[in-house]
Amino acid sequence: MAQNGSESGSTLGGVAGRYASALFELAREERAVDAVSEGLDRFDALLKESADLQRLVRSPVFTSEDQVKAIDAVLARAGITGLAANFIRLSAANRRLFVLPDMIRAFRALVRESKGIVQAEVRLAETPSDAVLEEIKASLRDVARAEVDVDLRIDPSLIGGIVVKVGSRMVDASLRTKLNSIRLAMRDAR
């Protein structure tokens, strides 16, 4: 496991990292990494869509029994079973649901690392065409010399251009940054 400032090194600290590492090792032993990933992705999507589920996960008001009952109902409705479901239940029983989103991120980082995939965050001012997105992915693959998983984010405040972050490196070629640089240069020239 990389601990040298790479994405997984920074993601795997604390409780989230310990839980994610334990889950990853168990999933790998049971040859269930893809199934666990799918279950966690499904739960993460539900979490992002449901304000009620977010409250359940974040609120200290609910007892662990209440959380486990509610989580059981959510898992059953979503069809999440096996190791992923047991992990989510364990998080609820141990009153760690509030850390679950970080655990899921850390697990994803371990999966990417095990498959030799690099995570890249790409921010653009507007949604790119499929062709442009493929060009960006191809360029990132060439630079990283690895398969790249692109997390695309739309940020209209960039005005134009692109901001790319891979690991601890970031390249900001946005129009907003260029305009700010010009503004500073002109102010200093006075």
Swiss-Prot record:
Q: Which PROSITE patterns match?
A: ATPASE_DELTA
Cited InterPro entries: ATP_synth_OSCP/delta_N_sf (IPR026015), ATPase_OSCP/d_CS (IPR020781), ATPase_OSCP/dsu (IPR000711)
Tell me the Pfam families matching this sequence. OSCP (PF00213)
* One GO CC term on file: plasma membrane
This entry's Gene Ontology molecular function terms read: proton-transporting ATP synthase activity, rotational mechanism
Q: Which UniProt keywords apply?
A: ATP synthesis, Cell inner membrane, Cell membrane, CF(1), Hydrogen ion transport, Ion transport, Membrane, Transport
Report whether Oxidoreductase shows up as a keyword of the record: no
Gene3D superfamilies per the UniProt record, alphabetical: N-terminal domain of the delta subunit of the F1F0-ATP synthase
List the membrane topology term(s). Peripheral membrane protein
Q: Where in the cell is it found?
A: Cell inner membrane
Record's subunit section: F-type ATPases have 2 components, F(1) - the catalytic core - and F(0) - the membrane proton channel. F(1) has five subunits: alpha(3), beta(3), gamma(1), delta(1), epsilon(1). F(0) has three main subunits: a(1), b(2) and c(10-14). The alpha and beta chains form an alternating ring which encloses part of the gamma chain. F(1) is attached to F(0) by a central stalk formed by the gamma and epsilon chains, while a peripheral stalk is formed by the delta and b chains.
For this chain, the family text in UniProt reads: Belongs to the ATPase delta chain family.
Role according to the record: F(1)F(0) ATP synthase produces ATP from ADP in the presence of a proton or sodium gradient. F-type ATPases consist of two structural domains, F(1) containing the extramembraneous catalytic core and F(0) containing the membrane proton channel, linked together by a central stalk and a peripheral stalk. During catalysis, ATP synthesis in the catalytic domain of F(1) is coupled via a rotary mechanism of the central stalk subunits to proton translocation. This protein is part of the stalk that links CF(0) to CF(1). It either transmits conformational changes from CF(0) to CF(1) or is implicated in proton conduction.
For this entry, the protein name equals ATP synthase subunit delta
Gene assigned in the entry: atpH
